[in-house]
Amino acid sequence: MKAKVEKIETNVIKLEIRVEAEKFDAALTKAYNKNKGRYNIPGFRKGKVPMAMVKKFYGVEVFYDDAVNFAIDESYPEALNAENIKPVDYPQVDIVELGEGKELVYTATVTTYPEVELGEYKGLDIKKPIYEVEDTEIDKQIKEMQEKNARIEVKTEGNIAKGDIAVIDFKGYIDGVAFEGGEGSDYSLEIGSGTFIDNFEEQLIGLAVGDKKEVNVTFPEAYGKEELNGKPAMFEVEIKSIKVKELPELDDEFAKDVSAVDTFAELKENLKKTLEKNNDEKAEREFEEAVITAVIENSKMDIPEVMVNKEIDAMMQDLEGRLKYQGLSLEQYMEFTGNTTEKMRDFMKENAERKVKADLVLEAIAKTEEIKATEEELNARALELGKIYGPKDPEKMAKILVKSQRNMIEKDIILENTLKFLKENCK
């Protein structure tokens, strides 16, 4: 095999590959052996027709498709390795010359991984932010727990006030015509929750059980349904009943009811620790994002469009998997959100470009700094994944993953170790 490299454009090269006549003839024989059971020639049993007779009867060209595939499957990776080329995607192959007893000559045009010119990446002036837990955050959490554990009682006297729950029947009209999805019965609406359109709930304050009222509102411009966006609407509303929330006392008994602790003081302390942990995780994410942004901005690279598209493909597959877990198809999700595949891919493009750039820069730094994944790290990560994908026998699944997904797991660990290296080397 001989290969000649021609640069077509940035990150695109054309390989001219020559496969020796002897090797192509061997590929022709391999093609014959693969297909000999398909040929029917009078006087020969099926599968026993000699190659020479098949060539005479059908022509040697009958073997070309498979023979070319066999020859390319062997010679293309060999050429990539010889020329130290790392392709991004499958090549565009064009046959230049072929024939029995002749060289197979073909070209393979392929997009390659871009070269990354690293800038400053050590000693970055970036610090991890610090977020203190405020008392108001703890109070908010406790208030939410109190609301969730409230008793709902029928309000026997008085009219609707803010914070009450109005049980209503309603029907909406636009220009005097009822619209789809604008009707409900025995709907429990907490006044002041902001559940309905702006100014809807406020117009119910002061009403009593049995009252009927025409409520006039305007749908937001970006409501999400074209036929309703920005439209004025009138709702016929009837008050069926009024309910109130009876909030539990914030004491030790409350703490026992909503958690595994015995005192209200312990409950507050646990909430504080949880918020501190959340704040630290948030700070760590922001720190990492700032470091990645800096090393990307300090580096130079031209990323091929195909790499971005492949990353978008992966993001779409991930979304589809998460939706499936929730019992939704991608088509249903797009219908609910008014999206199309093109809109979603456009929306994902910026994040996909950043992900590609981040991976390329981190890989380049890892190569420069000789950052590796140890066998211990690899096995530990495989075991973590084994517990997720093979909970009945995680150790067996871990061994399978080490064999089948080694490169992917190793890459993830190297990128994580590289990011850790960058953070440790910040000022």
From Swiss-Prot:
Keywords recorded for this protein, A-Z: Cell cycle, Cell division, Chaperone, Cytoplasm, Isomerase, Rotamase
Top class in the EC scheme: isomerase
Disulfide bonds: none
Gene Ontology biological process: 'de novo' cotranslational protein folding; cell division; chaperone-mediated protein folding; protein transport; protein unfolding
Family of the protein in this entry: Belongs to the FKBP-type PPIase family. Tig subfamily.
PANTHER family: TRIGGER FACTOR CHAPERONE AND PEPTIDYL-PROLYL CIS/TRANS ISOMERASE (PTHR30560), TRIGGER FACTOR-LIKE PROTEIN TIG, CHLOROPLASTIC (PTHR30560:SF3)
Name the record gives this protein: Trigger factor
Organism field: Clostridium beijerinckii (strain ATCC 51743 / NCIMB 8052) (Clostridium acetobutylicum)
Encoding gene, per UniProt annotation: tig
